[in-house]
Amino acid sequence: MNTVNETGPHKGRYLFTVFETGQSGVQRIDLLTGETETIWQGPAPGSHVAFDASYWTPWGSFITAEESWTTAAAGATSPYGRLFELKNPTTARGITLPLTASSNHDADFAHQTVVPRVSHEGIQFDQQGSMYFIDELNGGNVYKFTSAAKWGEIMSGRANYFDAGQTFVLRVGSGSVPNATGTFTWVPFTDANGVGLNGALTITDVNGVSSVDGRNTTNLAAFKGTDYQRPEDLQLQTVAGRQYLYMATTTTNEVYRIDLQRNLITVFADRATIDLATGAAAGAALSSPDNLAIDHDGNIYIIEDRNGGVDDDIWFARDLNMDGDLADAGEGLARWASNGTTGSEFTGLYFDPTDKRRAWVNIQHPASGNDRTIEITIR
């Protein structure tokens, strides 16, 4: 995925993306000079894997996380499922190859162990400072982390957001019905310091690092979260001061809308949604929604995970009255872009927050082996 430095000195100058590989890393593109640098990379194959999220925090750091975790009733011991914070993303010097023991020494890059282990993808922060994340799994859940630190102290640099905090899982009803919609509650499974509540699964991984196991804890009856089918990306939208969280689920071909004020989850888009090009239901034309994006006007975009050489599209969701459904006259889905690169998929569509006429998208794992970051401009 992609993000720019949304705050601080040189705001909007740098574009960041990550390597979703078996030796993950973080790349920075200087949009002023065109220089591209890797500013952090896993020191060895398998040490850090499947970085997916790219998110600029409100206090000016960069976070990413691993899309890799294990289902195990007693708790997993995988070294992965971690969330990392790069605290000096604009000033860390680019590394040179070959990698050595000192290659990453200029990057202040930390595993934030207070965040439970899951297979991470989408990450978003609301206006109150809560962080939302998912577990990318058939049967995965939606989570909220709330820092114990005061927001003003975090923003001024006097406190660390990830020093302590509480994590919750979203539950509709008893949590027993998968893909449920309706009123939900946030069920805590750690205390305010991030320590697992009684019965939660705290694991020590093969590297000797301890964390709460988010996935396997929220499969337990006491902490059961509502299961969704491969929840992937998240996107926050603000309408008239109210905050809504959108979530794509790849297996069920749906996008959900989570009303954070009313604690209500509904379906925003699915295969029954009108394709504005035909006037009929989108049907199988909408498949495997993966990433989400939002433009300056608050419109939601849905990015598919399909075969780029055949049928991989980005859909524009036309919600004229911003009421969270696409059922009103003139509303529906329209293809905004189509991929044409064999073996690839679109990923990481991101609209420049400083220029409403510019966006970026990645072409990931093409058959040629040549990944690309593409800039899209409207003039």
Where are these regions (language model features)?
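Sequence/structural signature of beta-propeller domains
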Residues: M1-R379
